[in-house]
């Protein structure tokens, strides 16, 4: 018998407060040092457990993604396979975050799926076990599963909890799709930033090693960042295209948003060192 719908599981966006590329490994992946922080803007997912093993996804996204490529369904299937759970789930995604903008929305959706279904299926895997499943699907997924702001190293899987200031951000989503794979394959991408200790990294100005390359290739990103820099310290998150400015108060961030040119899209968000997903998980 199908159960009631379990509602309002958040999948928050993340920002890379800094992103340094330290080298390329023999397997083609890049060694990184980055600082992840969540924000309070989220996709929302609902789940209903079913007796049969089918996995069904309903989404508000206009773009159709093949089931085999959809991270939410791949995450649910991976949890089934890892645990031997013989039921399934019906899943509803309310997609609110920009896609492909460096905010981690797809990875966050997959992480929320793993965490929520682990609870609802009563499969009782630890966060570390869920993160190991998630890492096979995407390097950003473990940080969303663990749910704390983190200094990440390696390909992004080695995490250390940190507590950066929970500032207010104005995030602008330029009308551009930046391919993460293309950025990391570009010969002009800096790959030799020295590895530094966390205390040193936290005390120096923060930067994104991908930013100069992306700005040079995407005029929309350059325009958004140039506008935002007039109001606040600003930089790109991930490989873009989204950029963010830092404000000490919501009022300041909203005042800047009110001046946003009509051809740009943006939103104000609060930095969070504990993910809204963890808050939801701790509810009955």
Curated annotation (Swiss-Prot):
Source organism superkingdom: Bacteria
NCBIfam families xref list: ispE
Pathway field: Isoprenoid biosynthesis; isopentenyl diphosphate biosynthesis via DXP pathway; isopentenyl diphosphate from 1-deoxy-D-xylulose 5-phosphate: step 3/6
UniProt organism field: Shewanella oneidensis (strain ATCC 700550 / JCM 31522 / CIP 106686 / LMG 19005 / NCIMB 14063 / MR-1)
Binding positions (ATP): 98-108
Catalytic reaction list: 4-CDP-2-C-methyl-D-erythritol + ATP = 4-CDP-2-C-methyl-D-erythritol 2-phosphate + ADP + H(+)
GO molecular function per UniProt: 4-(cytidine 5'-diphospho)-2-C-methyl-D-erythritol kinase activity; ATP binding
UniProt-recorded name of the protein: 4-diphosphocytidyl-2-C-methyl-D-erythritol kinase
Catalytic residues of the enzyme: 14, 140
Chain's role: Catalyzes the phosphorylation of the position 2 hydroxy group of 4-diphosphocytidyl-2C-methyl-D-erythritol.
Pfam families, A to Z: GHMP_kinases_C, GHMP_kinases_N
InterPro entries named among the record's database cross-references: GHMP_kinase_C_dom, GHMP_kinase_C_sf, GHMP_kinase_N_dom, IspE, Ribosomal_Su5_D2-typ_SF, Ribsml_uS5_D2-typ_fold_subgr
E.C. number(s) listed in UniProt: 2.7.1.148
SUPFAM superfamilies (UniProt xref): GHMP Kinase, C-terminal domain (SSF55060), Ribosomal protein S5 domain 2-like (SSF54211)
PANTHER family: 4-DIPHOSPHOCYTIDYL-2-C-METHYL-D-ERYTHRITOL KINASE, CHLOROPLASTIC
Keywords assigned: ATP-binding, Isoprene biosynthesis, Kinase, Nucleotide-binding, Transferase
HAMAP family per the UniProt record, alphabetical: IspE (MF_00061)
Transmembrane segments: none
Top EC category: transferase
Gene Ontology BP annotations: isopentenyl diphosphate biosynthetic process, methylerythritol 4-phosphate pathway; terpenoid biosynthetic process
Family, per entry: Belongs to the GHMP kinase family. IspE subfamily.
């Amino acid at each position: 018998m199908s159960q009631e719908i379990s509602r309002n599981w958040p999948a928050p966006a993340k920002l890379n407060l800094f992103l340094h590329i330290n080298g390329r490994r023999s397997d083609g992946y890049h060694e990184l040092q980055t600082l992840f922080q969540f924000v309070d803007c989220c996709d929302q997912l609902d789940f209903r457990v079913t007796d049969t093993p089918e996995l069904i996804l309903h989404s508000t996204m206009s773009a159709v993604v093949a089931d085999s490529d959809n991270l939410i369904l791949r995450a649910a299937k991976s949890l089934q396979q890892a645990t031997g759970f013989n039921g399934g789930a019906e899943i509803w995604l309310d997609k609110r975050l920009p896609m492909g903008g460096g905010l981690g929305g797809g990875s966050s959706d997959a992480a929320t799926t793993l965490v929520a279904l682990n609870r609802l299926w009563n499969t009782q895997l630890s966060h570390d076990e869920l993160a190991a499943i998630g890492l096979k699907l995407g390097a950003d997924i473990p940080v969303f599963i663990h749910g704390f702001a983190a200094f990440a190293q390696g390909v992004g899987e080695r995490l250390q909890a940190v507590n950066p200031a929970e500032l207010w951000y104005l995030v602008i989503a330029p009308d551009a799709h930046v391919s993460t794979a293309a950025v990391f394959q570009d010969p002009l991408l800096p790959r030799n930033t020295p590895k530094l200790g966390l205390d040193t990294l936290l005390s120096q100005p923060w930067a994104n090693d991908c930013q100069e390359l992306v700005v040079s290739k995407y005029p929309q990103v350059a325009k958004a960042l140039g506008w935002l820099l007039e109001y606040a310290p600003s930089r790109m998150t991930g490989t873009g295209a989204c950029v963010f400015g830092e404000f000490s108060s919501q009022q300041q961030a909203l005042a800047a948003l009110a001046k946003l040119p009509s051809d740009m899209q943006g939103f104000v968000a609060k930095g969070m060192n504990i993910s809204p997903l963890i808050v939801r998980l701790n509810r009955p």
